[in-house]
């Protein structure tokens, strides 16, 4: 049986340069790719503090992993979903698939041991959280 949680965690460490607390180009490359992917994304990030945003994404990925591992919705993810809802930042559902594809492309670039299992692990870890975020859009 394939341990996708372990595959994801090991890949995440590799893209961060070996430590989940280390800073590197992964998040810069992700946001460059994501913002360039759509005029709507660029508009949403026009006045955003990117240093803060990168820290939030780093924490969000840990929340996604937590949700995948425990099958429970972390409180932090509920708060993020509220901030991304129609009533707040108004992040529509279609941007999440774009977000995921940009994230996967960035993993491909930064993980020297990228493989089909690594990509699937990232998709599986993110899937439940994305489903939750899109569900909460109109809540």
Regions found by a protein language model. Name each.
Residues 1-139:
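Globin-like tetrapyrrole-binding proteins
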């Amino acid at each position: 049986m394939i341990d996708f949680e372990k595959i994801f965690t090991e890949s995440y460490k590799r893209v961060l340069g070996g430590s989940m607390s280390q800073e590197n180009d992964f998040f810069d490359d992700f946001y460059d790719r994501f913002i360039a992917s759509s005029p709507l994304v660029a508009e949403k990030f026009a006045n955003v503090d990117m240093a803060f945003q990168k820290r939030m994404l780093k924490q969000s990925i840990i929340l996604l992993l937590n949700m995948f591992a425990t099958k429970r919705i972390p409180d932090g993810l509920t708060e993020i979903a509220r901030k991304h809802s129609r009533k707040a930042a108004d992040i529509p559902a279609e941007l999440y698939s774009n977000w995921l594809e940009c994230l996967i492309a960035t993993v491909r670039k930064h993980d020297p041991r990228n493989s089909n299992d690594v990509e699937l692990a990232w998709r599986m870890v993110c899937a439940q959280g994305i489903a939750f975020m899109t569900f909460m859009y109109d809540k």
